[in-house]
From Swiss-Prot:
This is Biotin synthase. Residues 53-282 form the Radical SAM core domain. HAMAP family: BioB (MF_01694). Keywords: 2Fe-2S, 4Fe-4S, Biotin biosynthesis, Iron, Iron-sulfur, Metal-binding, S-adenosyl-L-methionine, Transferase. GO terms for molecular function: 2 iron, 2 sulfur cluster binding; 4 iron, 4 sulfur cluster binding; biotin synthase activity; iron ion binding. Homodimer.
Length: 332
């Protein structure tokens, strides 16, 4: 006789989280391993947590790629790496004027946070000064929150960015520590954690997440969420691998839409009070179930990513309105 598996009470687990009871790693794994027929129940439960902390608000972020390609690191997922053969645009730093223009485009797209991103291992002091000049002008002329993602930082650079008015610094953990050597050999997992800590020590809000679907196990996928909890990331971008042709991970099997939804729900259960953003791979991996993702996440990027295209801002605005949600402008 076939044994009937007992279903979890996902709503009860959600209400436990609302009452500030932390879920276990076993609970997180159970979400990821749940039968696909349970995914709507899981997302409904995740929404209980999301609504408790964020209501119906959705935060919009916009990226500007201020320096593309030319990166000496060998991250296997990245089309900007020196080892990548992907046909992308490659250029040195945009002018401060272009960076400031991008901020005004972010406002037109109804974004509250503007993300200044540059490829490379770490910025020079001259490059940090270049960014600071743009940041100061943006701060003087807009109400945007500013996030930077410039690579590894030292204490002095982090302090100067904070003093200039940078609100948030992004440096993703990318994958589980056990999986890191298979993704990159030119720096370590601990190097990435160190930069997150330096930003936080400087008084900058830490943003750190991962790219799911790079060969990590289900258990490691859950442990990533708890590691992000441990380092106290305020904002958690959940990226889903796009196996770009010309990168070492070309051909890697990408996550299904349902697998992506389970990741988002699990992340909300583990990090209930944090901004969880559906990031790279949203349109490609989630496809027609993108709106369901916002029942767990409360943030998205609007417009294009670093080297891959996003959907039109009007499509994102429409998706948010159709859900009965509201855009939260100029909020970190």
């Amino acid at each position: 006789m076939k044994q009937v598996q007992t279903k979890r009470d996902w709503k009860k687990l959600a209400y436990d989280v609302v009452e500030e009871k932390m879920i276990t790693k076993e609970d997180a794994i159970a979400i990821l391993e749940a039968d696909d027929t349970e995914v709507l129940e899981i997302m409904n439960a995740a929404y209980i947590i999301r609504h408790h902390h964020f209501g119906k608000k959705v935060k919009l972020n916009m990226i500007i790629n201020t320096k593309s390609g030319l990166c000496p690191e060998d991250c296997g997922y990245c089309s900007q790496s020196i080892i990548s053969e992907a046909p992308i645009d490659k250029y040195a730093w945009l002018t401060q004027e272009k960076i400031v223009e991008g901020a005004h485009e972010a406002i037109r797209r109804k974004a509250g946070t503007y993300c200044i991103v540059a490829s490379g291992r770490r910025p020079t002091d001259k490059e940090v000064n270049h960014v600071i000049g743009a940041v100061k002008e943006i701060r003087e002329t807009t109400d945007l929150k500013i996030c930077c993602c410039l690579g590894f930082l030292n204490e002095d650079q982090a302090g100067r960015l904070a003093e200039a008015g940078v609100h948030r610094y992004n440096h993703n953990l990318n994958t589980h520590a056990n999986n890191y050597d298979s993704i990159c050999s030119t720096h370590t997992y601990d190097d990435r954690v160190d930069t997150v800590q330096k930003a936080k020590q400087a008084g900058i809000s830490p943003c750190s997440g991962a790219i799911f679907g790079m060969g990590e196990t289900i258990e490691e996928r859950a442990e990533i969420a708890f590691e992000l909890q441990r380092i106290d990331a305020d904002s958690i971008p959940c990226n889903f691998l796009v196996a770009v042709k010309g990168t070492p991970l070309e051909g890697q099997k990408e996550l299904t839409p349902v697998e992506c939804l389970k990741v988002l729900a699990m992340m909300r259960f583990v990090n209930p009070t944090k901004e969880i953003r559906i990031s790279g791979g949203r349109e490609i991996n989630l496809r027609s179930v993108q709106p369901i993702g916002l029942f767990a996440a409360n943030s998205i990027f609007v417009g294009d990513y670093l080297t891959t295209a996003g959907q039109e801002p009007t499509a994102d605005w429409g998706m948010i309105a159709d859900l009965g949600f509201e855009i939260e402008e100029c909020a970190l």
